[in-house]
From Swiss-Prot:
ANK repeats lie at residues 683-712, 716-745. Gene3D superfamilies: Ankyrin repeat-containing domain (1.25.40.20), Arf GTPase activating protein (1.10.220.150), Arfaptin homology (AH) domain/BAR domain (1.20.1270.60), Pleckstrin-homology domain (PH domain)/Phosphotyrosine-binding domain (PTB) (2.30.29.30). Residues 290-421 form the PH domain. The gene is AGD2. It comes from Arabidopsis thaliana (Mouse-ear cress). Residues 2-226 form the BAR domain. InterPro entries: ACAP1/2/3-like (IPR045258), AGD1/2/3/4_BAR_plant (IPR035670), AH/BAR_dom_sf (IPR027267), Ankyrin_rpt (IPR002110), Ankyrin_rpt-contain_sf (IPR036770), ARFGAP/RecO (IPR037278), ArfGAP_dom (IPR001164), ArfGAP_dom_sf (IPR038508). CDD domains: ArfGap (cd08204), BAR_SFC_plant (cd07606), PH_ACAP (cd13250). This is ADP-ribosylation factor GTPase-activating protein AGD2. GO terms for molecular function: GTPase activator activity; zinc ion binding. Keywords: ANK repeat, Coiled coil, GTPase activation, Metal-binding, Repeat, Zinc, Zinc-finger.
Amino acid sequence: MAGFINLEDSPMFQKQVFSLEGTSDELKDRCQKLYKGVKKFMGALGEASTGVSAFADSLEEFGAGHDDPVSVSIGGPVISKFINTLRELSSYKEFLRSQVEHVLLERLTNFMTVDLQEAKESRRRFDKAVHSYDQAREKFVSLKKNTRGDIVAELEEDLENSKSAFEKSRFNLVNSLMTIEAKKKYEFLESISAIMDSHFKYFKLGYDLLSQLEPYIHQVLTYAQQSKEQSKIEQDRFAQRIQEFRTQSELDSQQASAKADPSDVGGNHVYRAIPRKNVEANSVSTADKEVTKQGYLLKRSASLRADWKRRFFVLDNHGSLYYYRNTGNKSAKSQHYYSGLGEHSSGVFGRFRTRHNRSASQGSLDCNMIDLRTSLIKLDAEDTDLRLCFRIISPQKTYTLQAENGADRMDWVNKITAAITIRLNSHFLQQSPARYLDKKNTSSGPATENLTLNQKEDYNQRLNVGDDVLTILREIPGNNTCAECNAPDPDWASLNLGVLMCIECSGVHRNLGVHISKVRSLTLDVKVWEPTILDLFRNLGNGYCNSVWEELLHHLDDDSEKGSTDTLASVSKPSSEDWFTLKEKYINGKYLEKALVVKDEREANSTASSRIWEAVQSRNIRDIYRLIVKADANIINTKFDDITDLDVYHHHHVDAPDEVKKRHDPNACQRIKNSNEARNCLQGCSLLHVACQSGDPILLELLLQFGADINMRDYHGRTPLHHCIASGNNAFAKVLLRRGARPSIEDGGGLSVLERAMEMGAITDEELFLLLAECQ
């Protein structure tokens, strides 16, 4: 009540009351907005708590709540510890939500429904009392002098009662308004500060909880990173195995095709004269069973329908032939694909399906053995129209089988024939194995036994192409060891960097991206190693390339600059025995950061552009390589305009569009007209244009490997392909077309490459014409 100087009912008093009521109404609006915000905040906290709990439950379902091998392999026991932490954090969020509800929302609701509402009700009662008081006063003052005394006394009493009620309601209204004025000074501050204290406790509890878990989290992250690196290595090795397998399969297919004898198709017994020494070697080579051949064959059923069923056949080195069929409730498509896979593949996914698919069981694969000791193999079938069939005839049953191709059929026939021979001679071989063991090392393998002389030469040429590449490249200085870790006998290479490396370092090079390093195998990617690539590597080699990329290492003894020493201290060359992470760090620093490259800071980019232009014109492969590596900017697409201040006759001040178009037409160029050679006008030409004019295939290959723009246009709109056609260099033109050059680009005269070539006369190179026509 201290805000009211005078408590008498006066206009000043009423003004103060109206002012307080206005403040209360404004406060009510603010409280309603705050109420909505608090409700949303509580809802968000509740959803967050529920979401964290759901996330924890899903993690438990994912694997943390099980002890099966799949759960263990994905880190279920580790995740379970994180789940407990997440649930604890969820309880903290729920605690914070309850604090917001009790400390803020309930008090805010009470303030709105009790205090503010009481002020509203007090105003309503006050207005009613004012009305009653006004009526009583009007009645009393309107009495005449001759009014009876009892009536005067009655109205006077009513007036006094109305005035008393008026005063009471007046002070009740003031009290309720002053209560609001008093509470607003501490109610909201107290509630909101309590909420902030609850937030502090919430985050402190979370921090304490996660601080205890921090060492464990870092330990798991370290383990995961190591597992990731190991997985990369294993994936690279697996990719190499796949490539080797595919290469070997192709060679086996070629070998089987070479062995195919047309005389065998006539129905004669395929009892090929397999040398005894090969049979002996196969029989006594190992005491354990090993798979000689396995794969799918179509088997004709013995039913009246005589339909074909796809079965998985396995032939081992002891002469046993098995086939498998799926007897589970799988669909025909699944049976067609997965028949026998769980037993003879690597087994990971087969075991997973068997364990987790309820419709399958451990006995879903039916295995059958064919006794080869009393069997005979023939290449025909009852239906002579079928080309790829052969039969295994035994006293018990005749098996009619069909392969996917002729080479596969002959491979099966030859290996089953050898298995029959093994079974027939097994008793004899067991009597004196020592004698045959002595002959093992001198026996020739069956792979080329039945090849003609020309077939053997072709086969050996294909087989040794990888060895030839290895021999050529390893004779280059420094190429006998890995360029990154000095591991002996590297069998991988980077095409654009010109270095050889081991398989482990090749994995790091792949991660750099093909714009940094294009990794290829010396033995598997046989089509890559064209003569031009080999010549490029002869010009470079590990020795020279590392003298550029590792120049700081090579000058360690003579370098006295502190900056260089610091760089070497942070990046040291690993050995072949070092961890993968050390090799990765070194290779990244070497090629991504160029940490070991000696750069001349005084040499500007314009100087580097001029020097590389001179090196290209002089065809100095090593200088070009060194300048590209040492340049801070990308100078591979340097133009003639970048090194020369052009103020030549092409720069006329002509505004007419026709004149401008005519000026760009190469036929209108005076220099080209005078010399009849496109090379005499270099305006706008790039390094690749000059390389095409030089006729040096190694120079062209180097620029393409480093990403030179193959479709860059000169002042006359001509691409390097235009220059090759204009100079009659068809070999270079075909190289550019195979590497992505677009012959549809028109020069300044509006003609494409094909049109320019036809303008020069008939195109006698048929391959060039086809390439131009296909890409047009």
